[in-house]
Amino acid sequence: MTGTLTEKILSRASGKTVSPGDVIEAKTDIVAFHDLTGYHVIEVMEKANMMKIFDKTKIVVAFDHLAPPPDVRSAEIQGNIRKFVKEMRLPNFHDINVGILHELLIEQYALPGQVIVAADSHTTTSGAVGAFAQGMGASDVAAAVITGKTWLVVPQPFKVTLKGNPGKWINGKDVALELLGKFKADYFNGMSIEVHVENPKAFPMDYRATVSNMGIEMNADALMFVPDVETKDYIKTMRGKEVELVTPDPGAKYLDEHTIELDKLEPLVAAPYSVDNVKTAREESKVPVDQVYIGSCTNGRLSDFRIASEILKGKKVKTRCIAIPSSYTMFKQAMEMGYIEDLVNAGCVVTYGTCGPCLGGHFGVAGPGEVIVSTSSRNFRGRMGSNEAKVYLSGPSVAAASAATGYITDPRDVQ
């Protein structure tokens, strides 16, 4: 039997040959949670009187949603999780100064062919390196922490092929929005999207992480990039580690296929109040903007800050602009490259890796009637603050161009 990437990963994890629709018990390679969900996971373990961990080296904990704590309750939650980490002697703990969980997973932990579960919907981000990564609720994650296993329904595989080279201002967000605009947000329910890149170096890991991150917005069970030379090079660069690639077999059968020609994409936005309300940036041009947010686990990586820096260098922003690299590593690299200095000189507020504005938590909550252009992942009512705010999702080029002009702007139109 020839297998897709999904089938090969889940066959290994379950110890048997699997097919779409099968209900399986799979061994987990990484189990993770953050501050906002972690205390629920711990509560489940406490109520079940099962305070044990299957393998301490395979648990990853990061503080990101409430980092630094904006109120007393947040500080209390983090304090309790720190106590749990200390008592359980967990080595892979990242406090408020390290970064967003999903960025840390691809930088330090996730590998091709792994099964990763975490208590957050954007766990699909780790699919960028070819891992089957899925977000789950606190009870399922607690069970995985205790047993090292989880149950899954093997999803139907859907093949996406990326052809050609993206234009100067096109990145992973435009590919994600292109898929959402064409197929809508509920189409991929029960499916695993496997992305094949014909020219691996034309679509780097930063771009892949953005697309995989948005897989949950497509309602996909997982969104994985087929591992290739870019995968190997990224992991070697970030960790000094050589990896074996897991790839689909020739002739593997897919439910359906779709091809995107990268050189034909335009800068896109998702208009309020849905991720699949996709339009070109030029269709929405001249909409006044109150605040721009560049960052999040969707678009807070080095290439995102390079693009923003290129557009904003030597200019002054015409509206509020908040820029947040997704991890300490990304912040440090962006600082060394001069990108942070360019953004600060342009008038942006820059801070370290926190989820803050994305979930309407802190560091830039949207007010009533405000229009936000954000590189984050969701734009439904109330996501970034007020129910009366309007959030447009975009890639870093549209976000930076909009900050430069004060209204939604295609980067090709910035002088």
UniProtKB/Swiss-Prot annotation:
The keyword Protein biosynthesis does not apply. CDD domains: IPMI. Keywords: 4Fe-4S, Amino-acid biosynthesis, Branched-chain amino acid biosynthesis, Iron, Iron-sulfur, Leucine biosynthesis, Lyase, Metal-binding. SUPFAM superfamilies: Aconitase iron-sulfur domain (SSF53732). [4Fe-4S] cluster binds at C297, C355, C358. Pathway: Amino-acid biosynthesis; L-leucine biosynthesis; L-leucine from 3-methyl-2-oxobutanoate: step 2/4. The keyword Lyase applies. Gene3D superfamilies: Aconitase, domain 3. GO terms for biological process: L-leucine biosynthetic process. It catalyses: (2R,3S)-3-isopropylmalate = (2S)-2-isopropylmalate. Binds 1 [4Fe-4S] cluster per subunit. It is an enzyme of class 4 (lyase). Pfam families: Aconitase. Its EC number is 4.2.1.33. It comes from the Archaea. Its cofactor is [4Fe-4S] cluster. GO terms for molecular function: 3-isopropylmalate dehydratase activity; 4 iron, 4 sulfur cluster binding; metal ion binding. Belongs to the aconitase/IPM isomerase family. LeuC type 2 subfamily. Heterodimer of LeuC and LeuD. Catalyzes the isomerization between 2-isopropylmalate and 3-isopropylmalate, via the formation of 2-isopropylmaleate. This is 3-isopropylmalate dehydratase large subunit. It comes from Metallosphaera sedula (strain ATCC 51363 / DSM 5348 / JCM 9185 / NBRC 15509 / TH2). The lineage of its organism: Archaea, Thermoproteota, Thermoprotei, Sulfolobales, Sulfolobaceae.
